[in-house]
UniProtKB/Swiss-Prot annotation:
The chain crosses the membrane at residues 15-35, 53-73, 136-156. GO terms for cellular component: plasma membrane. Pfam families: UPF0114. Belongs to the UPF0114 family. It is found in: Cell membrane. The keyword Transmembrane applies. This is UPF0114 protein ESA_00283. It is a multi-pass membrane protein. It comes from the Bacteria. InterPro entries: UPF0114, UPF0114_bac. Keywords: Cell membrane, Membrane, Transmembrane, Transmembrane helix.
């Protein structure tokens, strides 16, 4: 009975495979939205205001960071929790594949969230005159919470590695 339960639990990790595949569909949706934004601005590129162009570029950078986050979670999560990716050496292989454990993935995700939050905060500040002060304050508080959380997670990870946990 114990062996059956352990084998069933171990096999259940494959339930995550469609979830990681679903992230690739989310990446496809993000890519469509990215190019939709570019196609939307191209006819107006000569008449668009500089501030509006910068806001659009920040949105594109934001989407790119989210896309990178999706790829990182998709591949390293799959490798850490489901199965090793079987990519032949002759093919192009990401240098970090197989080297990122759950702890480093957590830290990279936290750093990505801070970067995404920074871009969003910059976009908000570019339009600060149209945003109420209390809303600006909450954006900053939320961003600082992300920064502090990422710092604390990194610090705790450093402590646990030095103590051999």
């Amino acid at each position: 009975m114990e062996r059956f339960i352990e084998n069933a639990m171990y096999a259940s990790r494959w339930l995550l495979a469609p979830v990681y595949f679903g992230l690739s569909l989310a990446l496809l949706a993000l890519t469509v939205k990215f190019f939709q934004e570019i196609i939307h601005v191209l006819p107006n590129i000569l008449t668009i205001a500089e501030a509006d162009l910068i806001l659009l570029l920040l949105s594109l950078v934001d989407m790119t960071l989210v896309g990178g986050l999706l790829v990182m979670v998709m591949f390293s999560g799959y490798e850490n929790f489901v199965s090793q990716l079987d990519i032949h050496e002759g093919k192009e292989k990401l240098s970090w594949l197989g080297k990122m454990d759950a702890s480093s993935l957590k830290n990279k995700v936290a750093a990505s969230i801070v970067a995404i939050s920074s871009i969003h905060l910059l976009r908000v500040f570019m339009d600060a005159k149209n945003v109420p002060d209390n809303k600006l304050m909450w954006y900053v508080i939320i961003h600082l919470t992300f920064v502090l959380s990422a710092f604390v997670m990194g610090y705790l990870d450093k402590i646990s590695r030095s103590k051999g946990y």
